[in-house]
Amino acid sequence: MAGGGTTLEYTPTWVVALVCSVIVSISFAVERLIHRAGKHFKNNDQKQLFGALQKIKEELMLVGFISLLLSVGQSKIAKICISKELSEKFLPCTKPAGAEKSLKDSSHFQFSFTGRHLLAGDAPAGDYCSLKGKVPIMSLSALHELHIFIFVLAVAHIIFCLLTIVFGTMKIKQWKKWEDKVLEKDFDTDQSIKKFTHVQEHEFIRSRFLGVGKADASLGWVQSFMKQFLASVNESDYITMRLGFVTTHCKTNPKFNFHKYLMRALNSDFKKVVGISWYLWVFVVLFLLLNIVAWHVYFWLAFIPLILLLAVGTKLEHIITDLAHEVAEKHIAVEGDLVVRPSDDLFWFQSPRLVLFLIHFILFQNSFEIAYFFFILFQFGWDSCIMDHVKFVIPRLVIGVIIQLLCSYSTLPLYALVTQMGSSFKGAIFNEQTQEHLVGWAKMAKRGVKKGATQVGTSHDATSPRPSIQLNSLLGKGSSQQNQNPKEKSEIAHHD
């Protein structure tokens, strides 16, 4: 085909076989690697991480479908014609003189008919529209570059999420020594009741309570902002919040392994973070729409995840401060140990889950920034007009690195600990085997209720609570302390 290179009919068989074998080998190696990782997670009872791996496979499958649609529909898309005037509006770069003769100097959304042809059929598509006095809505070259960008974005998001969870987990594992110190104590209930704790002398209160009044409240926010950059969580914070959680949800088991629960809860949340949800794809589309020359959208966009991350980190730190203020303002001394009271009221819109949504968006936004930078760098070069001036590029890269480090070592560990201070606990409070038994039992109970198989079953449903609904709530969105009767709490408390 003219200008398109030789077809498969006239390509040496050894070339076809070689290229095919390399592509298949790489694909097979990646598939085996994912399979082995899944097998490892299953053998080690890490079902939350296995779920996250399944989510990654779903994302890769979605990218595969997008790739297939672009490949199959590219010739049809290239034959959609629009007026030349319309094609020159909302460009990411200013069109240089003689752009029709030089594809190299044009942007990836520019439409050219006489430049290089990445795929056979580019010229016919251009000729098809030029005969009508119009231009293709998108050239095959631009479609090919968009294809590459979507793939780079998905891979970058997965890699950055993995790095974040790995570094965050390393930080949380440092807290294990505090958990071990607590578990080594001899828990004597009578002794605990007899002792009194002077609130103002408690280390947690001394480090978090600054006083009462507007000036002290403002200073508390400043302290919370600064603390996320330093020691975001210290030993007194961890031990106090651990005691608050155990006292609220596992009162009969003071030796509940809170650290192990944190790790399970974090792994469970990870599979929600690693995916690219529909609203994130909407964000990508909006960015591609608004990436107009002279607007510098790419530069200003870099500040969104940074501002959100600082706001989330400050809020999480301030929740710890609020817990200290609540005790210090009400008590001079308390009987037994100092205990904080978890509550959803501490969080924005009374929703601890909102924090996970924001972290998800922050990680994706940062991944998008880095992926877009490297895509432009390798596809069009450093001098590309989309890359913009150096004064805009360097700050973006610096901000991206700061976000990645701060989110990994400060915000994510803070999230893992502080969100346990809500009114509800997560299904991760049970180990994986117990969760499976409970879910299975709940499903069986629910089917029994629906069928109404026997009169006894019907009578039981009419006179007693419906455990299936309670357990579904527990293992899905969590279950508040108030919704659990003492017997259920006792059973929960002995699972770590």
Curated annotation (Swiss-Prot):
Region (Calmodulin-binding): 432-453
Residues in compartment: Cytoplasmic: 31-59, 169-269, 313-355, 419-496
Domain of life where this protein originates: Eukaryota
Region ranges (Disordered): 454-496
Gene Ontology terms: cellular component: membrane
Gene Ontology biological-process entries: defense response
Keyword Cell membrane recorded: no
Basic and acidic residues bias: start-end ranges: 486-496
Compositional bias (Polar residues): 455-485
Compartments in which it is found: Membrane
Keywords annotated in UniProt: Calmodulin-binding, Membrane, Pathogenesis-related protein, Plant defense, Transmembrane, Transmembrane helix
Extracellular face of the membrane: 1-9, 81-147, 291, 377-397
Role of this protein: May be involved in modulation of pathogen defense and leaf cell death. Activity seems to be regulated by Ca(2+)-dependent calmodulin binding and seems not to require heterotrimeric G proteins.
Protein name listed in UniProt: MLO-like protein 15
